[in-house]
């Protein structure tokens, strides 16, 4: 039980707060402490070492579930988490390169079918900048230069017609700050 004075597993005051709300119906808009979030799928697009993960942490850490292949280990786990986000109507961000239309379609189709708004952030992907940023990373975070070059060769610029509701262009600076601009075709 510990010295909390409450039941095991509950934080002090939780039972009292729950009892105070007993019998009252809450919605996402009226429940205390709950903020309604739009059903939103965010795709980050760009070379490795272009700033996507840093931007993701700064912009979406508190609001979206992060889908990242290195974090999850396998595409099967990623698909399970994606399906869970869609079923639970939870906003998510795909923190991966997503450089081809086919790679993006894997997320866009299911998200739109589930009623999600799809937003895209394309990171300026200059090969020499990504290689330099990669060299400055901690050894455990570095990607092989060959992998970055191969990704650069596959980039297909995204288009609104792919199913995005919003398109943004992101410039990453050496101090890990970002400038977000409207997309211009």
Task: Go through the PLM ranges and name each one.
Residues 1-25:
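Compositionally biased, low-complexity flexible segments
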Residues 26-34:
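Pre-Walker A adenine-sensing motif
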Residues 36-41, 57-58, 69, 88, ...:
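Catalytic phosphate/metal-binding cores of nucleic-acid and nucleotide-processing enzymes, i.e., regions
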Residues 38-41, 129-185:
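Conserved GTP-binding G-domain of TRAFAC-class P-loop NTPases and closely related GTPase folds
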Residues 43-57:
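Glycine-rich phosphate-binding P-loop
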Residues 53-103:
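Conserved substrate/cofactor phosphate-moiety recognition/catalytic segment
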Residues 64-66, 118-120, 166-169:
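Conserved beta-strand scaffold positions in the cores of enzyme catalytic domains, especially
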Residues 116-130:
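Conserved phosphate-donor/acceptor-positioning beta-strand/loop module used by diverse small-molecule
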């Amino acid at each position: 039980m510990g010295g909390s004075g409450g039941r095991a597993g509950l934080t002090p005051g939780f039972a009292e707060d729950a009892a105070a709300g007993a019998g009252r119906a809450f919605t996402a808009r009226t429940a205390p402490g709950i903020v309604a979030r739009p059903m939103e799928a965010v795709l980050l697009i760009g070379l490795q070492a272009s700033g996507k993960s840093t931007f993701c942490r700064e912009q979406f850490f508190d609001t979206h579930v992060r889908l990242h292949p290195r974090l999850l280990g396998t595409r099967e786990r990623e698909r399970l988490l994606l399906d869970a986000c869609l079923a639970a109507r939870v906003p998510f961000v795909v923190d991966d390169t997503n450089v081809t239309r086919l790679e993006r379609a894997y997320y866009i189709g299911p998200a739109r079918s589930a009623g999600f708004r799809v937003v895209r952030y394309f990171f300026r992907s200059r090969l020499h900048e990504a290689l330099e940023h990669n060299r400055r990373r901690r050894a455990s975070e570095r990607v092989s230069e060959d992998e970055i070059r191969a990704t650069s060769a596959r980039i297909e610029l995204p288009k609104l017609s792919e199913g995005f509701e919003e398109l943004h262009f992101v410039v990453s600076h050496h101090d890990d700050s970002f400038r977000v601009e409207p997309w211009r075709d």
